[in-house]
């Protein structure tokens, strides 16, 4: 858990499958530690009335053409699937990938896709986080004990079996989110990894809250891997070249306006230094079609070694 790991999250929107498959292969060949994708039914960047692929099937497709990187949703929408089914899905992915699956899960937030697909969205985020807590409890039982029982307010199951078990002795559960009253409590109880993002002060505060929850539930906080999402990254030696590529992203994703992290490999490593010093050792960034091979290659060959040096200092 102590080494630096880097990952990439290729968007499943506004892209064809051969291109999406190829970027997964390329990342794996370059030595990325993890491959992620979204779990959304409508695009979340730019115009929502555009094409997007389903998350678990993207991961299954990558499992067939990769051999190294772990595979997970960043993060799965708990509302989309019965939690017992989610445990079965990620277990199947673990077998398809020879033990490389991660169960990424969160409370879900994009109301438009829920309404369109007729998926229950609850009365608010607080209720969905209550659902998440019950769901992760059941999923953890199934993944770790081979069967699970749920007698909560929202989910009901009696000795539901998960057979075959995962390939991994402990298939990791990653929970994304920052809520101090509910999400981080759930992370402390069940998660093997936690995902967050934001400026250093924000992340430091959330990490402190998580540590307090770990103390309260009797959990060693060091057991929980910290992961950091950077959003879109463009590595170039000249800012004008980076801006030119950003314009290509905007053309392919109309309405996309988020500001990417732009800089040289050294500048990006310097930007990440305080997070590594804080204990975040698994860092990933978003990648959108048209996929940027220069950034993909330089992040793993130039940024990662610099972060390893920070960790070792």
Q: Whereabouts are the PLM-identified features?
A:
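Active-site-adjacent structural elements that line small-molecule/cofactor binding pockets in enzymes
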Residues: 1-313
């Amino acid at each position: 858990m102590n080494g630096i790991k880097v990952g990439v999250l290729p968007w499943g929107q506004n892209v064809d499958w051969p291109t999406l498959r190829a970027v997964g292969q390329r990342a794996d060949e370059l030595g990325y530690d993890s491959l992620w994708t979204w779990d959304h039914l409508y695009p979340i960047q730019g115009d929502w009335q555009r094409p997007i692929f389903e998350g678990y099937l993207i991961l299954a497709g990558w499992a067939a053409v990769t051999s190294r990187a772990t595979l997970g949703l960043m993060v799965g929408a708990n509302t989309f699937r019965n939690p017992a089914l989610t445990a079965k899905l990620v277990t199947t992915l673990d077998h398809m990938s020879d033990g490389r699956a991660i169960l990424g899960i969160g409370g879900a937030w994009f109301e438009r896709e829920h309404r369109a697909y007729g998926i229950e969205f609850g009365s608010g985020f607080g209720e969905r986080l209550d659902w998440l807590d019950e769901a992760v409890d059941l999923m953890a039982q199934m993944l770790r004990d081979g069967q699970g029982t749920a007698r909560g307010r929202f989910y009901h199951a009696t000795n539901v079996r998960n057979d075959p078990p995962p390939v991994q002795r402990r298939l990791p559960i990653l929970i994304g989110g920052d809520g101090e009253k509910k999400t981080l409590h759930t992370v402390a109880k069940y998660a093997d990894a936690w995902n967050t993002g934001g400026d250093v002060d924000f992340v430091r505060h959330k990490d402190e809250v998580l540590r307090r929850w770990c103390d309260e539930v009797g959990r060693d906080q060091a057991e929980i891997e910290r992961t950091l999402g950077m959003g879109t990254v463009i590595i170039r030696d000249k800012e004008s070249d980076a801006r030119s590529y950003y314009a290509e992203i905007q053309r392919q994703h109309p309405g996309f306006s988020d500001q990417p992290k732009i800089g040289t490999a050294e500048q990006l490593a310097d930007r990440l230094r305080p997070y590594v010093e804080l204990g975040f050792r698994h860092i990933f960034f978003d990648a959108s079609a048209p996929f940027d091979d220069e950034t993909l290659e330089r992040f793993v060959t130039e940024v990662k070694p610099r972060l390893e040096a920070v960790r070792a200092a």
